[in-house]
Amino acid sequence: MSDNPTPESTPEAETPEVEKPMEPQGKVFDEAYVQSLRQEAAAARVAKKDAVEAAEARVKAEYEAKLAERDTAYTELQNQLGQAWIELEKVYLSLDAKVPNDKVRAFVEILEGNDRDSIAESVKSRLELVGGFGNKTPSPAFDPSQGRGGKPPIPLNGDPILEAIKAAVGIKK
C-alpha cells in the first residue's frame, strides 16, 4: 500500500455529470394566464365575502325584528302589571276604609290616582262625598206585630194597656 496511487487503477478523466431525466421540470406559464387566475381567485373571495355579509345582514334584520317584537310585548306586560297594581291598591284602600263588600267595585270605579298616596287622598275625598259607610248604627229589627220580644203579653183591659199606649204616643203623666 503505497502512498502513490497507481495510474492503472484510477481513471484519469473526471466522471461527467449525468443529467437527471427522472426529475420533472417546472412548467412555465405566461404572465397573462397567471393574472387571469389571480383575478378569478380574487373574484371568488369577494363573492364569498359579499355572500357572508348579506347573510349576516339578513340574520341581524330578523333578530332585530324579533327583538323589537319582544320589547313591545314586554312593555305591554309592564303596562298591564302597572294597571293591575293600581286597581289592587284601590281595592285594598277601599277595604281599609270599611267600604261594604257589595259596594267596593262601584266605589273603586270613582277613585282616581296612580300611586298609593294619591289613591288614599281620593278614598278620603270620596268617603266625605258619599257620607261614609258603616258610621250609622243599624236599628235592631223590630216588628210590633210579633209580640213584645219575650216579655209577658199585655192584658187587653186595665192600666197596663193604657200605659203602653201613653208610652207609644209620648204622653207623660
UniProtKB/Swiss-Prot annotation:
Residues 36-84 form a coiled coil. It comes from the Viruses. Keywords: Coiled coil, Viral capsid assembly, Viral release from host cell. Residues 1-13 have a biased composition (Low complexity). The keyword Signal does not apply. The keyword Coiled coil applies. Residues 1-27, 134-158 are annotated as: Disordered. Transmembrane segments: none annotated. Scaffolding protein involved in the icosahedric procapsid assembly. Coassembles with the capsid proteins to form the procapsid, in which the scaffolding protein is found within the external shell of icosahedrally arranged capsid protein subunits. Belongs to the L5likevirus scaffolding protein family. This is Probable capsid assembly scaffolding protein.
